[in-house]
């Protein structure tokens, strides 16, 4: 199984792979913590405090009330450390969970591709209450598009 090949990617209609990772507070968080209760917007991003990632995180922050109004949980994942996530969340007042995937095992599990073969990709999954992937957004450069499309997908699945 190759890393990030299209045939390895989690796609619409498939059950989202389960995982457990440490959050910015050091607490272990599992996808199962949300399933059965609320949909999850799971967004993979390249790196804390880079311009595009900061824009994307702040866009999720700015629309966080809309996600809450749709009873959805936003969760960000990158390979940065717990400490890096803590600082990133505090510096930008991020109200949602950031998970540390050091080593990239969950990124690989989801088949998130690298951009130009070098940089971790930017992919967002909208996962319904039952754990089924309902929408996938993949755009390295249009970070704010992830937020807009995730909200549209959540509205569509009700």
Per-range role (PLM):
Residues 1-158:
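Chalcogenol-based redox active-site neighborhoods
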């Amino acid at each position: 199984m190759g890393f990030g090949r299209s045939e390895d990617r989690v796609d619409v209609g498939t059950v989202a792979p389960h995982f457990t990772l440490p959050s910015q507070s050091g607490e272990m968080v599992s996808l199962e913590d949300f399933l059965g209760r609320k949909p999850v917007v799971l967004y993979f991003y390249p790196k804390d405090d880079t311009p595009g990632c900061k824009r994307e995180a702040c866009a999720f922050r700015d629309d966080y009330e809309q996600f809450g109004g749709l009873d959805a949980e936003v969760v960000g994942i990158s390979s940065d450390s717990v400490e890096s996530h803590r600082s990133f969340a505090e510096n930008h007042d991020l109200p949602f969970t950031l998970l540390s995937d050091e080593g990239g095992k969950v990124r690989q599990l989801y088949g998130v591709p690298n951009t130009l073969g070098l940089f971790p990709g930017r992919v967002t999954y909208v996962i319904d209450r039952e754990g089924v992937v309902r929408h996938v957004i993949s755009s390295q450069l249009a970070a704010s598009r992830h937020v807009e499309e995730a909200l549209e997908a959540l509205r569509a699945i009700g």
